[in-house]
């Protein structure tokens, strides 16, 4: 065999190994996101079982989100220099142990602890998984690799949460957490067996990494993510209510419409990963425009089921495409501290999700449910303006 053939074979083998590792990271992401959001469908059952109100049970969701937002960036900055393979395995074992603790919890305080611990680990996973996927795939395929990892989010939203809720109805909410315990441990084992060792990045101090927070271009990209997630979840949070109360869809059928929304989102995930590599800010503006069109057209289209379905296809594709677009765009804005940048984007996304839900709720209270899509579309258009100004700022800096 010639040296050229040997080199080609070695490159092919490395590519196959990298692809397998990225796929398993996506599966691990599926388990982690399911762990985060499955509890939403379990709240009534666990509230009854633990003898607490549904509002108090709902604080478990708030606890998780705020923990991710507050602790994610400093923890990721401190741990970003560690061996990635070991980091992922430890995180998945933490999720396994936490889910087991949730399954045996006898009161809300134990369950709160079982939610607090994995919330500390989740942003570290997403920050390092995104950067690791980029390293494994190489700079030319970084966007597609991050999109593949983010496919775990889409799959969890589409299959994990509804199927997990059905599973919990059959075997109880504790059984659902036991299932997640086993899946988390399985993902840790698969990564241990398949992922190549990735050389730790040079240890950079917190002060050095935090310098990205003084970079106007990076901060503009972070603000852009907050605006986009505010727009996305300002309307998406109330989509089920919109389908039922405005479109007149039977409650038993709303779930299938939401499943369809998630299914077309898989297309958006692939498109976002493809185009963000070519133009991070350009792809942001394009999909933000589609998002605004979809959200604002949802109420006018509600009188026709075929037209509504077409609008939701546009909305669903744009909504899911913006997940990998935001992540890789923010990471590209801080190449010297990508893990911290990725985690800051996760925190920004959580801030946007919370802010969007609040804005949507206030819109319903003062303007009615039918105005939610329009208000969210205005925020999306504002994000386009910010993206355009950020692009101009980058072009001026390059001169």
What are these regions (language model features)?
Residues 282-326:
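C-terminal transmembrane helical hairpin of 12-TM major facilitator-type secondary transporters
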Residues 51, 83, 104-110, 248, ...:
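Helix-breaking motifs and short loop linkers at transmembrane-helix boundaries and internal kinks
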Residues 71-83, 268-280, 364:
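Helix-to-loop junctions at the C-terminal end of transmembrane segments
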Residues 110, 139-193, 238, 242:
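Helix-loop-helix hairpin linking two adjacent transmembrane segments in secondary transporters
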Residues 70-109:
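Conserved MFS/SLC helix-loop-helix module at the cytosolic interface between two early adjacent transmembrane helices
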Residues 125-137, 321-334:
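Intracellular juxtamembrane helix-capping segments at the cytosolic ends
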Residues 94, 98, 109-117, 306-314:
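Paired small-residue
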Residues 114-152:
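Cytoplasmic helix-loop-helix junction between adjacent transmembrane helices
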């Amino acid at each position: 065999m010639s040296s050229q053939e040997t080199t080609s074979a070695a490159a092919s083998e490395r590519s196959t190994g990298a692809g397998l590792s990225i796929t398993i990271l996506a599966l691990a992401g599926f388990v982690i996101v399911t762990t985060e959001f499955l509890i939403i469908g379990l709240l009534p059952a666990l509230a009854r079982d633990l003898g607490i109100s549904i509002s108090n049970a709902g604080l478990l969701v708030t606890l998780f989100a705020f923990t991710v937002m507050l602790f994610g960036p400093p923890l990721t900055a401190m741990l970003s220099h560690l061996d990635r393979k070991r980091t992922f395995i430890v995180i998945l074992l933490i999720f396994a142990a936490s889910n087991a603790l949730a399954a045996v919890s006898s009161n809300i305080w134990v369950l709160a602890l079982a939610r607090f611990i994995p919330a500390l680990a989740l942003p570290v996973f997403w920050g390092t998984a995104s950067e690791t996927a980029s390293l494994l795939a190489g700079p030319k395929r970084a966007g597609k690799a991050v999109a593949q990892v983010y496919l775990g989010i889409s799959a969890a939203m589409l299959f994990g949460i509804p199927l997990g809720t059905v599973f919990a109805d059959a075997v109880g909410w504790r059984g659902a957490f036991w299932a997640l315990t086993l899946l988390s441990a399985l993902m840790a084992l698969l990564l241990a067996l398949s992922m190549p060792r990735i050389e730790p990045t040079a240890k950079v101090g917190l002060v050095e990494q935090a310098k990205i927070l003084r970079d106007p271009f990076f901060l503009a990209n972070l603000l852009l993510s907050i605006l986009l997630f505010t727009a996305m979840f300002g309307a998406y949070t109330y989509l089920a209510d919109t389908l039922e109360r405005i479109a007149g869809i039977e409650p038993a059928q709303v779930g299938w419409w939401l499943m369809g929304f998630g299914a077309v989102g898989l297309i958006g995930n692939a498109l976002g990963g493809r185009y963000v590599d070519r133009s991070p800010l350009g792809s942001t503006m394009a999909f933000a425009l589609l998002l605004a069109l979809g959200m604002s057209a949802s109420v006018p289209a509600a009188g026709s089921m075929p037209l509504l379905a077409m609008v939701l296809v546009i909305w669903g594709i744009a909504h899911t495409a913006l997940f990998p677009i935001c992540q890789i765009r923010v990471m590209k804005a801080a190449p010297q501290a990508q893990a911290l940048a990725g985690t800051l984007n996760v925190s920004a996304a959580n801030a946007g999700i919370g802010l969007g839900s609040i804005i949507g709720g206030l819109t319903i209270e003062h303007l009615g449910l039918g105005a939610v899509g329009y208000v969210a579309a205005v925020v999306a258009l504002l994000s386009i303006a910010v993206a355009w100004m950020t692009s101009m700022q980058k072009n001026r800096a390059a001169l």
